[in-house]
């Protein structure tokens, strides 16, 4: 059994029939369908659960609705993404706290800092304001966090080192940093969300490939960030067909296989460990049945 620790199935990309990525004997293939069909396929391929992070006040409402439509399969988290925080009113922060207190919410996220895009200085200040507020909320509610940190590790680590919320644990979502950065998050006790970034060509993935061997297996979760971060598959699928194609949890076996290769361990051991890690970190109400020998 595999759990997708980070997907956005409430995204508009899944609200009408769509083209999506799956796997076949050649590696990858495209299919046409809708979200209900995709969720049936995930159930059939033993990828029954996913964690659905909020990224804005509107999406927090949407993830709670989606979780109510798929009880016991979709687990909601509440948060404001750093790049969305500049569009939210600070006076509306009480709405976020109200969402976070809803039954079934398992974490605060995704939250953090993102300096990838050029921003005015006041935008970074607003990111910091929301980040610390949401860490405070996580600490108050005793919930782990899902962290989004891009091109901002120095500032994020400085905040995380002094904030008590680090004691509750969390995951660095979509990690693709170097060994040196991984070591700093390891010292703070965080987990690492590994997804499509590990399935890119070497020139793009070499830092992450170098970091994976030093990250203990008990600190790794697998994720997709669907519908985003497609694996490299232009060698088997025409690039023009990949336009507007959605990523899905169906690629997770490939992520697990690559982690196993880089760590020199069995695929089964990675699958079992990452599933257990996800269940334990987020206290998921999921029963894990060991694979038959």
Where are the predicted features?
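Mid-domain alpha/beta scaffold segments of enzyme catalytic cores
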Residues: 1-293
């Amino acid at each position: 059994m595999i759990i997708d620790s980070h997907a956005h199935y409430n995204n508009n990309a899944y609200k009408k029939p769509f083209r999506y990525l799956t796997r076949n004997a050649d590696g990858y293939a495209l299919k046409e369908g809708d979200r209900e069909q995709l969720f049936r396929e995930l159930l059939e391929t033993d990828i029954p659960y996913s964690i659905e992070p909020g990224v804005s006040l509107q999406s927090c409402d949407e993830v709670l609705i989606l979780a109510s439509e798929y009880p016991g399969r979709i687990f909601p988290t509440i948060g404001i993404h750093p790049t969305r925080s500049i569009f939210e009113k600070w006076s509306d922060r009480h709405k976020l706290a109200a969402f976070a207190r809803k039954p079934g919410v398992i974490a605060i996220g995704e939250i953090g800092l993102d300096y990838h895009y050029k921003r005015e200085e006041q935008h970074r200040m607003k990111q910091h304001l929301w980040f610390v507020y949401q860490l405070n909320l996580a600490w108050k509610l005793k919930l782990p966090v899902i962290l989004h940190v891009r091109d901002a590790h120095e500032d994020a680590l400085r905040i995380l080192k002094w904030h008590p919320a680090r004691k509750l644990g969390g995951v660095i979502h979509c990690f693709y940093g170097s060994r040196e950065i991984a070591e700093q998050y390891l010292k703070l006790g965080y987990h690492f969300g590994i997804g499509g970034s590990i399935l890119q060509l070497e020139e793009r993935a070499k830092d992450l490939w170098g970091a994976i061997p030093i990250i203990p297996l008990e600190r790794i979760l697998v994720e997709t960030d669907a519908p985003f971060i497609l694996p490299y598959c232009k060698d088997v699928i025409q690039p023009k067909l990949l336009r507007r194609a959605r990523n899905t949890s169906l690629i997770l076996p490939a992520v697990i296989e690559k982690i196993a290769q880089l760590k020199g361990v069995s695929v089964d051991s990675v699958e079992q460990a990452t599933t257990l890690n996800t269940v334990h970190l987020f206290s998921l109400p999921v029963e894990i049945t060991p694979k038959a020998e």
